[in-house]
Amino acid sequence: MNKLFALVLFGFALAVPAAPQTGQQVLRKDPLMTWLLARYTRDRNYIAGAAEKMPEQYYGLRPGPQTEVRTFGELVGHLANYNFLICSNVKGEKNPNQGNDFEKLQGKAELVKALNDAFAYCDNVYGSLTDASAMEPLPAQVQKDAGHPVELRVNLLIFNYAHNYEHYGNMVTYMRIKSIVPPSSEPAH
């Protein structure tokens, strides 16, 4: 058994330096934020694509008769609101959207602009953090305002990514109801 263990260990020792030569992926700098940025970017593109692709006439669509369920347009506004809120908290600065409620906007053009502005704001946040800075605690005032215990910046970014993806799933349902193919199901170009 010890000989087998030594042989396996020796094999790993030989394989690790050979990885770059065999085309295997080598661990990049900031692997956590590299991974999270790639997932956030993919999903933000799906969401922005869905907002663009959905015809304006369906922005008032609900998937059923329940008025407490958001319309497609309200989902777009909700995502704009929360991307500004969460990313401003991660940055430790005042929400640039404070006092506005994009869920109340009516026109597709206004909603798409609000969403794209929110994503542009978050792009900077996701793109500027390293693994080390992502592990820093949120500013004390953010924690106090939110009523949260000590949280790390990355916690909120992961929440934002999951929240975006959750609501993209909702958007897909609205699109499918109207026989519109969502961006994530379009054939690769």
PLM features per residue range, with description:
Residues 46, 50-51, 87, 118-121, ...:
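Well-ordered alpha-helical scaffold segments within catalytic/enzyme domains
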Residues 1-4:
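Positively charged n-region of N-terminal signal peptides that target proteins for export
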Residues 55-59, 91, 127, 131-134:
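Short, flexible helix-adjacent loops and helix caps
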Residues 6-15:
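Bacterial N-terminal signal peptides
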Residues 37-41, 45-48, 59-100, 142-189:
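Short, contiguous alpha-helical
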Residues 104-141, 150-167:
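Acidic/histidine-rich alpha-helical segments that form the ligand environment
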Residues 22-42:
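Short N-terminal segments immediately surrounding and downstream of signal-peptide cleavage
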Residues 16-20:
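Sec/Tat signal peptide C-region and signal peptidase I cleavage site
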